[in-house]
């Protein structure tokens, strides 16, 4: 269950809270120990990859409080569970006390999930389906009540069942190839990616940003594709797989926004920017550590940063690459706003050889920005955008007195 979704931890936790006597059961503890043993490969994978799942959910997804995220939470839950269904379940829970231990657990599962993710909405967007685990206790409660309460049974037959039929009809409708459905992004994707394939040929296709496009390209064409993440997007499983390593210094088709060498390819179904390169270069795996003593700045202040840059690749990184030049920048992030600050290097880096580590000092000037806390880091910027190469620390920018 945990292998499928981490929300399973909540299912287990709420079950224990509703049935504390489980903690006295030897069989309960044996089952828990056995489950942990089964999870050892997953824990090892997390450790080996710097806990990407936890980093993604606990750090990367955290957007801070946004009223919109809070206001959309309950409407999204109504849409997921069907307002008529969850409305009936809530009515049953308020009108009837749980009749036994099993029903008490069902009640707590439903209430626990809804309340827990309501509070999560204070720190960012909650995907509507995250609470789907409580649909099982919801259905069980409603089914049990239909057996004993004729009013609930009539309500279910009159209102809930027709909505289920509408849902099934809508699902069938989305499987059709109607043009209107294709424009809603429910289908018709194969032709788009086939046209992209006709331009790329047998070259691997390199996308920027999210994982969806390379995944669909590989699915529909059976050919290789990869996503290169940047600070403008979240990291994906492609950052763990690191397929791009085998494409470096080799020909590839780069599918990114129309900048520099990109040409615009357009047809009736798709429009995209891209170009062929005979030598791909990416820098996402370059590691940068740095030391900054001052963490309180005003606009116009000079910042001096000592850094160490390591190239873990088995090939050189050319900062003056003809297609993918690289620049070292300071990055300042506040909310969704990202600012790249140009730097001056005491000893300009033009090449980092395979496995090499270089060090130096950079100087920059804090730009005129709004007062507040910013995340500070160093990044290598190239055609795919600024990459995640260093840790980020908090600094404060204050207005001049």
Each predicted region: which residue ranges?
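Transmembrane-lumen/periplasm boundary regions of multi-pass, lipid-linked membrane glycan transferases
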Residues: 11-102, 115
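Hydrophobic/aromatic-rich transmembrane helices and adjacent perimembrane loops
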Residues: 124-151
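Short, solvent-exposed, Trp/other aromatic-anchored flexible loops in extracytoplasmic proteins
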Residues: 340-385
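Short periplasmic/luminal acceptor-recognition loop of GT-C membrane glycosyltransferases, typified by
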Residues: 199-235, 319-333, 346, 377-379, ...
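Periplasmic/luminal catalytic loop of GT-C fold multi-pass membrane glycosyltransferases
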Residues: 239-285, 308, 368-371
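Short amphipathic, basic-aromatic surface patches that mediate peripheral association
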Residues: 309-320
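Membrane-proximal, lumen/periplasm-facing interface regions of secretory-pathway glyco-
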Residues: 128, 153-202, 210-231, 255, ...
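Transmembrane-helix signature of polytopic, lipid-linked glycan biosynthesis machinery
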Residues: 2, 108-127
